Amino acid sequence: MELLWNDLSVLRLIHRSTEQVEVAGSIPPPGGCRAAELLDCSAEVEISNCKTETGKLNFEGRLCITIAAADETGDTFAFVGEIPFSHCTENADFAAGMLSNALPAVAVLDMRLAADGAAAFSANVNIDFIVTSAAPVRVLSGVSGVADMEIKSMQCRTARRVEIGSETIRFSEELSSEGADSVLSFSAQISVRDTAIENGGTSVSGIITLNALLKTSDGELMQLTRGVPFRESLSAAAGADEIYTVAELKNVSLRALGTEFSLLAFDADIDFRIFGIRRSVIDIPTDAYSPSLNFSCMYEKMTVANACGGSFAQHSLRENLSVPDGMADIFAALNAAARPIATNVSIEDSTMTVEGLLFTRIIYRSSSNRIYSFNDDVPFVLRMAAPSEANFAQLRLNASASISGGSGRTAQVSYNLDVSAEYFSESAVSAVAGVAETDNSNDADGKSTGIILCNACAGEDAFDIGKRFGVPSQRVRELNPDSAEPFKDGDKLLLFV
């Protein structure tokens, strides 16, 4: 017998997981400087390449470390290092050409002062990734010469994320900062808060949050926390629903223009990617039989992946952080920096709950004019609306921290947390991918023949009854015109076999 085929266009979820990569190294201070104490350490991570091969997924990226330190005289300075890394995860289902999407986040960051004055660090990077395949799936559509073959199908709604526009824009802004002479370290984070169609174009708006440790001409430390709004008009193709935008900052710089101007110059490239959702409905064959030909179905199990759109939410909190035992009291709290990490994400009843930690670093000055720093972990829980069909999400977390007060053994810190989410759903389906001839696939109830009165099971339809007894489903309907499908448990059906 010759099998007839149909190719389904469906996005399949191959694998999703979170991999942890350890990155370690040391960063020497700039020439002429020797660190006596490390005050702060911040890190940014970027995945530059993510590609599938047969049986494996390869990651390549870089970790950028910024260290703020003090020498033996108490003078402060900063230095930067970049460490490349690579990682490979193996899976027998991976194949070349599959689609992959990876989001990295620094989960753990430790630093210590090495004997040679360099800053030794170790970091754990979490890589949240999804691997999908858009290759057509071959399914059964019939058997040549078997006219009475019946195929049962289910309608499957698909929603595929498509990129409808991308653009890189150079963004520049001058910020006022009284007394700032130099920038020791800073972080810049971008959050897209709205994407809208306006006047035939796409308007994207949001905020860039800057957190900087600055130094005055007198050697004093000061903190700058600033939100810089942006609004850009971009081009995007039509024909997609529920558009949203993902943005990344690259080639970022922040520099002081001199104490006489009291200004900081911020520059960055913003990579915008606009996504939309294109929906369709496909028929997936789930079962088949023929009254005249004995065969059994062969199935291919797959997980259909659908995009559910994106959303944005904000969360604020205030915490009192205590100075560890053995350290001097706070005379002046100088700087707070926070790095967020999600420890648990769940979606239930159209609500996403995110639990996590804000890894916080505090720098302060004691009454003896010495600079100290300490770490603390602040837990958080936030909830935000999620699409009803969503099963999981990929998150981008941005956090800013600022000193709102501090003295004695306590520093008061205010946090702002931005959450950008891309939602997805997954559903398992078994499709008929072939048949194999058998001798008894259509034998039923001990090969009963004649007039039969059978009991239906709950949820069965004429196809199920027809397959069980080897008769056309249309005959089942004709003999039982008053029985509605799907049948109820115990419904009595008349058959001629």
List PLM regions with ranges.
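Membrane-lipid interaction segments
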Residues: 1-448
